[in-house]
Amino acid sequence: MRHYEIVFMVHPDQSDQVPAMVERYRSIVESSGGTVHRLEDWGRRQLAYPINKLIKAHYVLMNVECGKDELDELTSAFRFNDAVIRNMVLSRDEAVTEPSPLAKGNEKREDRKESEDAE
C-alpha cells in the first residue's frame, strides 16, 4: 500500500455535511485494510480566486495509506459528489502524522482567544 495526501474542498452551503462525507471516505479507505494517518478539518476559508462563483469553501486534509483500488474509488466518489468543488491527491513517500502548518496556526489562534477571554 502507498501513502497519499488528499485535500478536498466542499461547497460552503454543504459544510454541515462534511463529517458524514469524511466518515464515508474514511470507510472507503479502511474497508480493505487501509489507514487514515491524519485527518484535519480546516473549516471554511477564503479561496484565492472564485470557483463556480464561490469565494469560500470548506477544506479537509487526509493523509491515508491505501491501495490503488481504494484510491480510484475515492477519486470517483469525489467526482460524483456535487458538493466537492475541487480535490487533489498527492503521492507521499511515507506517512505524515504531525499537524500541518495551517492546523498549528489555528491552534495558536485558539490559544490566544482563550487567554484573552480569561483576562
Swiss-Prot record:
Q: Does the keyword Iron-sulfur apply?
A: no
Q: Which GO terms describe its cellular component?
A: cytosolic small ribosomal subunit
Q: Does the keyword Lipid biosynthesis apply?
A: no
**CDD domains hit by this protein:** bS6
Q: Where is the composition biased (Basic and acidic residues)?
A: 105-119
**What Gene Ontology molecular-function terms does this entry list?**
small ribosomal subunit rRNA binding; structural constituent of ribosome
Enumerate the Gene Ontology biological process terms. translation
Region Disordered: start and end of each range? 95-119
**PROSITE patterns listed in its UniProt record:** RIBOSOMAL_S6
Which Pfam families does its entry note? Answer: Ribosomal_S6
Matching InterPro entries? Ribosomal_bS6, Ribosomal_bS6_CS, Ribosomal_bS6_sf, Ribosomal_S6_plastid/chlpt, Transl_elong_EF1B/ribsomal_bS6
- What keywords are annotated for this sequence in UniProt? Ribonucleoprotein, Ribosomal protein, RNA-binding, rRNA-binding
- Its biological function? Binds together with bS18 to 16S ribosomal RNA.
Kindly give the NCBIfam families that the UniProt entry links to this protein: S6
User: Can you tell me which family this protein belongs to?
Assistant: Belongs to the bacterial ribosomal protein bS6 family.
Q: Could you identify this protein by its name? A: Small ribosomal subunit protein bS6
Q: Which organism is it from?
A: Halorhodospira halophila (strain DSM 244 / SL1)
Give the source lineage, highest ranks first. Bacteria, Pseudomonadati, Pseudomonadota, Gammaproteobacteria, Chromatiales
